[in-house]
Amino acid sequence: MSAVGPRNLARLADETFERRGDYPALWFEQVWQTSGEQFGRSERIAAGLAEQGVVAGDRVVVMIENSPDVPVAYQAIWRAGGVVTPAIFLLTAQELGRLIADASPALVLTTPTFREVVDEAAKGVRVISDLGTLERAEHLPIVPRDDDDLAALVYTGGTTGRAKGVMLTHANLWEAGRHGHEAGHVPGLDLSLSCLPLAHSYGLLVLNVGMHHPGRPQSVLMRWFEPQAWLELAQEHRSQIAPVVPSMLYMLLAQPLEDYDLSELLYVACGAAPLALGAIEEFLRRVPGVEIREGYGLTETSALVSTNPPGRPRYGTVGPPVPQTEVQIVDGEICVRSDLVMAGYWNEPDLTRETIRDGWLYTGDMGRLDGDGYLTIVDRKKDLIIRGGFNVFPRDVEEALLEHPAIATACVVGRPDDVHGEEIVAFVTLSEEIAAEELVAFGRERLGGYKYPREIHVVDALPLTPVGKADRKALRELLTVQGGTTT
């Protein structure tokens, strides 16, 4: 769908409903909701938001776990001219309080489950914990918004320090949906299974890609990811495509995949963090006929930069850039120029100037492009470990460790060291019992002397960020209280 006039996301929703009509569109916890029910609710809630005083440009925080209420709330906010400000429901009151203080929202939307946390965090801000109370009989006409007006303020950076508000415009999100559709659409691919948190930029991308689908797509939505339930739903609903993050795929590999009929599953889209090549190979072997489409994006690029094209994946890469997106490598760092690049960081003009230079977004990720334009992610620039003057990328070490059959997941960090500057430390979870000393020896056999982890900590589970990434910050903190095996 091409834009004629301002790329207002509320207008996109209107046009999408007009084109598709009313049909069963969203399944959630045993109930199908129709597109008409969803669209009508968003119109009525938009009227309630306007009655509450929400005007063009106002931020509205949405702290609701996955449910049909989330896309309805987003569409209502856009219709009222507001700025969607998602908050992951796992935030503490202190974390949410910092977000609210920074965003200065007009309103917070939540559910009774989180009312206590929100009330503690949102002092002086009106809170509504039942979307139904906002529904009005009348429908609110779309409040005009232009391409460059803010559509979403998405907070990111939980693994890198203080969270930053990423300003995404209506044009950013419209084009992310369009480019994502153009890069990945397969005719007849209509049945999806979604477990991504809709408060994350990846989940927001999936919603916007869906609005550009030319047919009548149907989606099964999970409140949260649970591997056995995911497999049961994929089998029951004969899901054809499922977006996940790597930690979800690793958990699926621990399940008896062969016991489920996944014959209709054609594509698993994976992003948000690097995916180990060994995990890809194992999933492909155990689920014949599926294709894993690994992609790459940041919140700062509307969650999209590149993706492996259907039928032409190059495993180990994240594919070529999507349409209208340029990538260049500067001193090893991935830089992006695109209509997907954010307007900037909220209340952070200096950081914005540092991150976007001469129209190029400096991502902080290290990577390389091959001769065909496929992008490979090497690691996060800030996660680079320098041991004895040698650069060590954690992902290289993790990939080597994951070759051991007893290691289920791995995450590598650096800790300060008086002799070498930094020492390499690995945290692993196991699928079978083995001594940490044996794992250190295994790493030494496969990695250079400067590169193998001298310490390996066996843990029951890796700490994860709210969006399923291994939390390196938490692991570094663990090093101060937990001993390890050193050789």
Write out the residue ranges for each language-model feature.
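AMP-binding/adenylate-forming catalytic core of the ANL superfamily
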Residues: 91, 242, 338, 343-344, ...
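Structural core segment of the AMP-binding/adenylate-forming
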Residues: 51-52, 79-137, 141-143, 430-432
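Conserved AMP-binding/adenylation subdomain of ANL enzymes
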Residues: 174-191, 199-240, 255
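Conserved AMP-binding A3 loop
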Residues: 32-37, 151-178, 308
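Conserved pre-ATP/AMP-binding loop-to-beta segment of ANL
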Residues: 6, 22, 138-155, 162, ...
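Conserved AMP-binding/adenylate-forming core of the ANL superfamily
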Residues: 2-6, 14, 22-67, 71-75, ...
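Gly/Ser/Thr-rich phosphate-binding loop
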Residues: 239-244, 255-313, 326
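Conserved ATP/PPi-binding loop(s) of AMP-dependent carboxylate-activating enzymes
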Residues: 320-324, 331-355, 392
